[in-house]
Amino acid sequence: MKNIRNFSIIAHIDHGKSTLSDRIIQICGGLSDREMEAQVLDSMDLERERGITIKAQSVTLDYKASDGETYQLNFIDTPGHVDFSYEVSRSLAACEGALLVVDAGQGVEAQTLANCYTAMEMDLEVVPVLNKIDLPAADPERVAEEIEDIVGIDATDAVRCSAKTGVGVQDVLERLVRDIPPPEGDPEGPLQALIIDSWFDNYLGVVSLIRIKNGTLRKGDKVKVMSTGQTYNADRLGIFTPKQVDRTELKCGEVGWLVCAIKDIHGAPVGDTLTLARNPAEKALPGFKKVKPQVYAGLFPVSSDDYEAFRDALGKLSLNDASLFYEPESSSALGFGFRCGFLGLLHMEIIQERLEREYDLDLITTAPTVVYEVETTSREVIYVDSPSKLPAVNNIYELREPIAECHMLLPQAYLGNVITLCVEKRGVQTNMVYHGNQVALTYEIPMAEVVLDFFDRLKSTSRGYASLDYNFKRFQASDMVRVDVLINGERVDALALITHRGNSQNRGRELVEKMKDLIPRQQFDIAIQAAIGTHIIARSTVKQLRKNVLAKCYGGDISRKKKLLQKQKEGKKRMKQIGNVELPQEAFLAILHVGKDNK
């Protein structure tokens, strides 16, 4: 056991985590040169296209160190994006140490900080690594000082390497073996294994990634899931070298995969503890704290026949993604679907894209909203995650919106632009600290503004230099209103949005104008209105198509023309009473972009 090292790699987006893992796999001979490819651990097509890591992946390698010993390295590559920070915390729970990778050109960024603090809270040994020293812009001395100044760990003798060229990666491994402590645990004790992650394989059923804390797990053992008490047979187990390799046993301190032929998706929840049925452990390991979704949106299949397939797909996806929340929802405009909760807009986009790709579904998304806390006049507190669930105006005593605490790191040159943006987003500054030429800003900004397009606009005002990390702080009373959209006097529930009263007029007008361009013209006038309660705040009309009924009159008497026009008018009136309007899919997407283009 003293030769096992469990660690994960944490860093900001694009600081080279996945490339460094490629090099480590290559040096330790996990894959032959023929099988080696860039970002070998990003197995999803989506990850490769966007160049980001979404799922954490684990690998077991053997490394012969300079002291002649052979060490078993279990390492986990983690995502860097703020929406996937829960993936990072789950991976860290399985480790004793972490490599903090910092780009020697860019320096410390917000995510570096957030992930590093997560690691320190879990008492992990953090080993700083300066990557990309082959770049002409690299300044390792300055960055080492920055790490010490901002993060607070000693980085004077931090390992310097370039994952792209392979320089210094050997030193990284040596430092790992030296600085990261071996796992603790009792190999003879009753089995306790933590489920770090699980996913669904169409042939094997549920595959779980586990870390053995105490005891030993052998092939063919009867294992018990501690939260549900159900027992399963350990059919196959093994390690990833990144390929799946079968083993006969997993020993104390190791990380590996396990297949128990579990058909039910909820059979082995992430964060649960496995133990042996015949010699169970007394208590479960502390799991992970459940992450609360921050953004909710309705997802509906375009054709209602896909509803069953959509439900199964969501079930399989939620096994792989512990933070996805969903419940059935029906809408008069869109039929049956699900209300889904996500950690942020990127997460929402990724989930929607994965559903469309991996499960071949066509989906419509409604506008994303956040959760509001509503105190009704009867003093009851309810949580509202969709505009249609908001009680009537006269029943609301107080409406509170979620406030996010946003930590931003940015160069001084962009400070003015960023502050202007934060104020426009109704933000309140709580802290500002200068570190060299970097500024650490802390703002409290309403979550609704953060999830709309704050991240994109922060990046564009600061030319991509600012970085953001945000978390939910509290609920705060605020003057929010629901803007309904009426089409020919009928409310369309899927188009409603909740917004601040100050912005409501603009938002309403903008939405109505957008809808006007998207709804095809019919034989009668279509009135599109935005309303708060019964008060109409904006209106536009899609004009009718009409035939020229006067074309056949030659010269002709004025009364003859009037008669024909009058007849046409009456026909249109009758048509309007019975006609209904088909809304194209673009109309629903229009709301997603309200408040974005005109800035």
From Swiss-Prot:
Positions of GTP binding: D14, H15, G16, K17, S18, T19, N131, K132, I133, D134
Domain tr-type G: 2-184
Subcellular location: Cell inner membrane
Protein topology in the membrane: Peripheral membrane protein
Protein EC: 3.6.5.n1
Record bears the keyword GTP-binding: yes
Chief place where the protein resides: membrane
Signal peptide limits: none
Gene Ontology MF terms: GTP binding; GTPase activity; guanosine tetraphosphate binding; ribosome binding; translation elongation factor activity
Pfam families: EFG_C, GTP_EFTU, GTP_EFTU_D2, LepA_C
Record's function text: Required for accurate and efficient protein synthesis under certain stress conditions. May act as a fidelity factor of the translation reaction, by catalyzing a one-codon backward translocation of tRNAs on improperly translocated ribosomes. Back-translocation proceeds from a post-translocation (POST) complex to a pre-translocation (PRE) complex, thus giving elongation factor G a second chance to translocate the tRNAs correctly. Binds to ribosomes in a GTP-dependent manner.
Stated family: Belongs to the TRAFAC class translation factor GTPase superfamily. Classic translation factor GTPase family. LepA subfamily.
Protein name: Elongation factor 4
Organism: Escherichia coli O1:K1 / APEC
Gene name per UniProt: lepA
